[in-house]
């Protein structure tokens, strides 16, 4: 397994690929911004139901739910912020993702380097 394999599977929302290539390095960081697997997962769209399954797998494996990137963004920031910036997101997918992250302990009050909270990104999507 290479770091590229798991990163590619995460980016494409490939649940089976994640299962195949995941080797227990749950809090490994990717990209120059220091994204963990959960943050990387929510930077991309497509395969939404698979993405939610991957998120649950990562949570079950013990990923740090409130990990912050170098820009102080969390997975919840990425789920809501990327949806506005990069694609037209399905509201049901976003709601399911938000519920999943909050139930896993995501802090809704974390502020990124711009002072934004996940809620401020959610409001901006409307």
Language-model segments: which ranges?
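Surface-exposed loop/turn motifs in large extracellular/passenger domains
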Residues: 47-53, 86-100
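Ankyrin repeat domain, specifically the short helix-to-loop turn at the C-terminus of the second helix
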Residues: 19-27, 54-64, 96-107
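Short secondary-structure capping/turn segments at boundaries of alpha-helices and beta-strands
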Residues: 25-27, 44, 91
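Generic beta-strand or strand-like secondary-structure segments
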Residues: 53, 57, 75-78
């Amino acid at each position: 397994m290479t770091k590229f394999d798991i990163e590619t599977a995460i980016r494409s929302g490939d649940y089976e690929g994640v299962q195949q290539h995941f080797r227990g390095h749950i809090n490994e960081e990717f990209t120059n911004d220091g994204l963990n697997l959960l943050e990387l997962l929510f930077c991309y769209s497509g395969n939404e139901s698979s993405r939610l399954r991957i998120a649950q797998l990562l949570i079950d494996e013990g990923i740090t739910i409130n990990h912050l990137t170098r820009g102080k963004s969390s997975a919840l920031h990425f789920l809501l912020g990327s949806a506005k910036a990069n694609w037209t997101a399905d509201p049901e997918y976003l709601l399911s993702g938000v519920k999943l992250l909050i139930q896993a302990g995501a802090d809704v009050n974390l502020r990124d380097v711009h002072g934004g909270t996940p809620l401020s990104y959610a409001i901006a999507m409307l």
